[in-house]
């Protein structure tokens, strides 16, 4: 992965616990600033479902040997420079940073077959340049009814677009045809972004 140093070290990335959507926005911003030619090959990926109960393994916040946690949603960054080369940058995983797509999906999401339907994972994949323009959050979802913070916010100002003050729900929503980007089931997500060298060779013959 030595040629994929979009982010030389995880320590060089902006990170605040429980603000994954902003952490990924900052990664997109960093690529636009330092490697603009790669921005068109990058994506922000939201993971959620209708009930907002998605199990993920190998997470720093997880419990037990498998480090499993159930999030209402999660967001990670993806770099897809070649048809058979896709890397995942997840600031909350215990896997390497970055991790090859197939390894990340296999260890983080495993399979929906052993899960109840209400725990099946869906993925909203948004081009990085679109995410930079359209994402907006005033962080209201991280406040209690009395106005106090559930988790301390980032020190920088809220990320606000020119047209909206808070559209996080549009990104978490997994209804096809609503919100930016494209929505996939787990199997569709894998089919779209995992192309092994063997499969590519067959397609080219």
From Swiss-Prot:
It catalyses: N-terminal L-glutaminyl-[protein] + H2O = N-terminal L-glutamyl-[protein] + NH4(+). InterPro entries: N_Gln_amidohydro_ab_roll_sf (IPR037132), NTAQ1 (IPR039733), Prot_N_Gln_amidohydro_ab_roll (IPR023128). Keywords: Hydrolase. Its EC number is 3.5.1.122. Mediates the side-chain deamidation of N-terminal glutamine residues to glutamate, an important step in N-end rule pathway of protein degradation. Conversion of the resulting N-terminal glutamine to glutamate renders the protein susceptible to arginylation, polyubiquitination and degradation as specified by the N-end rule. Does not act on substrates with internal or C-terminal glutamine and does not act on non-glutamine residues in any position. Belongs to the NTAQ1 family. This is Protein N-terminal glutamine amidohydrolase.
């Amino acid at each position: 992965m030595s040629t994929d140093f979009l982010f030389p070290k995880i320590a060089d990335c902006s990170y605040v616990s429980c603000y994954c959507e902003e952490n990924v926005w900052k990664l997109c911003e960093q690529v636009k600033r330092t490697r603009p030619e790669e921005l068109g090959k990058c994506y922000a990926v939201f993971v959620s479902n209708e009930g907002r109960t998605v199990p993920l393994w190998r997470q720093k916040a997880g419990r037990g040997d498998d480090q499993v946690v159930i999030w209402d949603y999660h967001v990670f960054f993806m770099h897809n420079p070649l048809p058979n080369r896709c890397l995942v940058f997840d600031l909350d995983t215990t896997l390497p940073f970055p991790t090859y797509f197939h390894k990340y999906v296999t260890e983080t999401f495993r399979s929906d077959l052993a899960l109840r339907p209400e725990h099946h994972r869906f993925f909203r994949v948004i081009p990085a340049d679109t995410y930079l323009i359209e994402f907006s959050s005033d962080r209201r979802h991280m406040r209690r009814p009395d106005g106090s913070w559930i988790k301390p916010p980032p020190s920088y100002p809220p990320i606000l677009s020119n047209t909206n003050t808070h559209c996080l729900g549009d990104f978490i929503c997994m209804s096809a045809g609503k919100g930016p980007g494209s929505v996939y089931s787990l199997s569709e997500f894998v089919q779209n972004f995992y192309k092994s060298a063997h499969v590519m060779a067959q397609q080219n013959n």
